[in-house]
């Protein structure tokens, strides 16, 4: 099974950007954590980051033919992008939305997610561990779906 993990704007600055909110873990550290977890689960992953909404949409579209599932931390686009929501909905892949911080405990504008209505699940507030939790969750979902098939 192949999982695409997408990261949106400003996540390339993890480790130095607002460590009191996002922690000291870098995106490279998170990718390494995900690689280790994926290997343990027998998954292949593709891990990407971009600061551009259109690139995220293109990557979601590409995942349609390359992946069995999608994990996305869309950063601030979570709260603003109908286009990302439409892209996720259009590819019909099980999708887990991830946020390092608890978006519901922050500013009120962060309480709205355009992705949650089209996602299988949402993990927020657990820092970098949320990505590992997302891999566990999507693996469990996919293997349950496989075992339910005749």
Curated annotation (Swiss-Prot):
InterPro entries: DHquinase_II, DHquinase_II_CS, DHquinase_II_sf. The active site is at 22 (proton acceptor), 99 (proton donor). One of its GO terms (biological process) is quinate catabolic process. It comes from the Bacteria. It catalyses: 3-dehydroquinate = 3-dehydroshikimate + H2O. Pfam families: DHquinase_II. The keyword Amino-acid biosynthesis applies. Its EC number is 4.2.1.10. Pathway: Metabolic intermediate biosynthesis; chorismate biosynthesis; chorismate from D-erythrose 4-phosphate and phosphoenolpyruvate: step 3/7. CDD domains: DHQase_II (cd00466). The record marks 17 as: Transition state stabilizer. Substrate binds at residues 73, 79, 86, 100-101, 110. Keywords: Amino-acid biosynthesis, Aromatic amino acid biosynthesis, Lyase. GO terms for molecular function: 3-dehydroquinate dehydratase activity. Belongs to the type-II 3-dehydroquinase family. PANTHER family: CATABOLIC 3-DEHYDROQUINASE. Catalyzes a trans-dehydration via an enolate intermediate. This is 3-dehydroquinate dehydratase.
